[in-house]
Amino acid sequence: MAAAVLTDRAQVSVTFDDVAVTFTKEEWGQLDLAQRTLYQEVMLENCGLLVSLGCPVPKAELICHLEHGQEPWTRKEDLSQDTCPGDKGKPKTTEPTTCEPALSEGISLQGQVTQGNSVDSQLGQAEDQDGLSEMQEGHFRPGIDPQEKSPGKMSPECDGLGTADGVCSRIGQEQVSPGDRVRSHNSCESGKDPMIQEEENNFKCSECGKVFNKKHLLAGHEKIHSGVKPYECTECGKTFIKSTHLLQHHMIHTGERPYECMECGKAFNRKSYLTQHQRIHSGEKPYKCNECGKAFTHRSNFVLHNRRHTGEKSFVCTECGQVFRHRPGFLRHYVVHSGENPYECLECGKVFKHRSYLMWHQQTHTGEKPYECSECGKVFLESAALIHHYVIHTGEKPFECLECGKAFNHRSYLKRHQRIHTGEKPFVCSECGKAFTHCSTFILHKRAHTGEKPFECKECGKAFSNRKDLIRHFSIHTGEKPYECVECGKAFTRMSGLTRHKRIHSGEKPYECVECGKSFCWSTNLIRHAIIHTGEKPYKCSECGKAFSRSSSLTQHQRMHTGKNPISVTDVGRPFTSGQTSVTLRELLLGKDFLNVTTEANILPEETSSSASDQPYQRETPQVSSL
């Protein structure tokens, strides 16, 4: 009884016109997308509350328009037409009916609906307030079958459930004239659930064919094609298609991070980022590849992985036609054509194509190396460098060459190695036309043309074109020899020197001549040997035109023209010094009588405590004449 009194009082005190807001076509056109969406949500919510209280809702056409995402204003010539798609072709009546199911006193929270009074006999039993809210969200309470909610009260032609917004799409009243004549929606002859009917009212994009079930969603999507970005950030001027994107972006300026991980305390400015981060702790990988079974934490990584199986490369460079699987790779490549270097270092003025390169460069000024290896304590500027380094400790080499079986610890190393088999040399010098297999070699070669030597020694000021050369040179100042042979204890300043030295102990000769099968320990020896077969003599004397197969042979030959010999002696058995008569080491070892040195002493001291075995160059003393 109390509920009935409350309902009667609500019907008297509140009407739909009291809470409704209407716009003309011109006023509606001045609203932006966010304001229109807010208006639709508020109007539908108010209507739902009035229906739950049993109040009549006469503006059926307005509500139906809002349900389908359409404009709330109507043309006069449309007032005589049917409001809902299911009513086409039906005769109009003037029987006043309302969509105002009253609250039943016996409704159970578990979904058991007891029979009660109903204003409209064809709409049947009403839902409780919780049930209406669930309908507004587009779903029903668990355990309740939509067909079982009001048994015996529904017309077989209309289930009366309403649309996803919780308002019956067959509201039953439509204003057709100033005299407030209405027609009745007594039944829906379509025989379909209005939820299904709403899905069939699809709005299709004329540009790409994408389909939406709401008109305002289509309007938002069309901005992608038109390029309209009406929402502008007041801080940096960046524009966005959606207001939600602007709100998310604004947190970058405010520094706000409201979503905090309960496990590690890390905070994020978006809830989706927190959800993705929490999968690290839970180990959840919901995205699984059907081809190889590999699972991923993030959907974006899963999509990129799938392109490896399909071979899809979605991003095509309009300048050179090169295609890329990933958008970041495409953007990095495109800067090569534009020549743009928008990121400048405030310390030294150096400019970079990419922001990440600038960030890495800035760490050279600060000396910061935030990534530390847990095994050996070595620190790195970049996380990628740490990952590359860590494979040294694990010894893992998962990338194997199918041609020769050689394995590598990084995919990039395998790709570079495979060019040896294919003979591919994609990097061509525009100056001389020389081609290279590796990009790093190509960059070093270009410095030969430009004369650039960006790596300078802080000790002596000597500059180098290659960073590795600087590292090798610096060991001269430090005297450090970190690479020690475990067999004999000999130490080396370079890793390559130790590797070559180890071949002496192992007897390994990996460099084999394809002509005669002779093997060598070092690649340089193989190169020298190969000249024997080719007959090539690239080193030519500029004086007489004689050619040699080795540079050392040319150097020796040129001394005949200059008259200079590299070794100077005061006397045999004493250290060599400059400024005295010079002889070649070859002649000295052969024991040729050539010496013509100004000295008062014999070439070999007469008094010596050394044995003959300690004097490898001792021989009969020649007569020395004065100059």
UniProtKB/Swiss-Prot annotation:
Question: Which positions are linked by Glycyl lysine isopeptide (Lys-Gly) (interchain with G-Cter in SUMO2)?
Answer: K425
As for subcellular location, the record says: Nucleus
Q: What is this protein called?
A: Zinc finger protein 264
Q: Which SMART domains match?
A: KRAB, ZnF_C2H2
Q: What does this protein do?
A: May be involved in transcriptional regulation.
Region annotated Disordered sits at 74-155, 174-194, 605-627
**Which species does the entry assign this protein to?**
Homo sapiens
- The transmembrane segments are none
* Domain of life (superkingdom): Eukaryota
Polar residues composition bias: residue spans? 107-124
Phosphoserine: which positions carry it?
S80
